[in-house]
Design a protein with these regions (language model features):
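Signature of uroporphyrinogen-III synthase
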Residues: 1-200
Length: 200
């Protein structure tokens, strides 16, 4: 992609790891992002936590397993993961490690099914917006918060948007029909999708 296009990238989000305590010993932990895992690993509880884990995304799974954690289920997005819990694990207690800008999918699904859970804010996400001129031909988005950050000082305009998953795409669809969603929540696949699009 870089050989054929001018590529500009910047961190649209600043992540601040937060100290946390566990309100109740869970049967299972749930991680929806790598940032939640990094906060968990920075906490002393990571050295003694032995309960099985469910997570969203292959890279989240890899980070957990690289640090000795047992992942029993990986989903492409939180809605898929909650559906799995509702069907197979309704009588368990879950702890969701998340950020301050989390989407309501986990809590809504658990409440709807009457499943016991707690949520811990393990990190804070701060938006870092920057004006982009000229208007890019393509925009790669990795989270709904990234979309929100970009829109603080920019508009989608005629740019083609590439989203890492359906959750991120949901934040973009009201704004444009020029949209491609990565087949999996994987950064390399997203870049490949953009490269393929602009080689046409």
């Amino acid at each position: 992609m870089a050989a054929q296009c001018d590529v500009v990238d910047y961190d649209a989000l600043q992540i601040e790891i937060q100290p946390f305590s566990i309100p109740k010993n869970p049967n299972y932990w749930v991680f929806s992002s790598q940032n939640a895992v990094r906060s968990f690993l920075a906490n002393p509880i990571a050295s003694i936590q032995q309960n099985p884990i469910l997570c969203v995304g292959e890279k989240t799974k890899s980070l957990l397993e690289e640090n000795g954690q047992k992942v029993i289920k990986t989903a492409h997005n939180m809605i898929e993961l909650v559906n799995f819990i509702q069907k197979t694990m309704k009588n368990e207690h879950f702890l969701h490690m998340c950020g301050n800008r989390k989407l309501p999918d986990f809590a809504a699904g658990m409440q709807q099914a009457g499943i016991s859970y707690d949520e811990v804010t393990a990190y804070h996400t701060h938006l870092v917006s920057r004006k982009q001129t000229p208007e890019p031909q393509g925009l790669l988005f990795y989270s709904p918060s990234g979309v929100e950050s970009y829109l603080q000082t920019n508009s989608i305009g005629a740019s083609w948007c590439f989203c890492i998953g359906e959750t991120t795409a949901t934040a973009v669809r009201p704004l444009t029909e020029r949209l491609t969603v990565s087949p999996k929540a994987n950064a390399d696949l997203l870049v490949a999708a953009a490269a393929t699009h602009f080689r046409r």
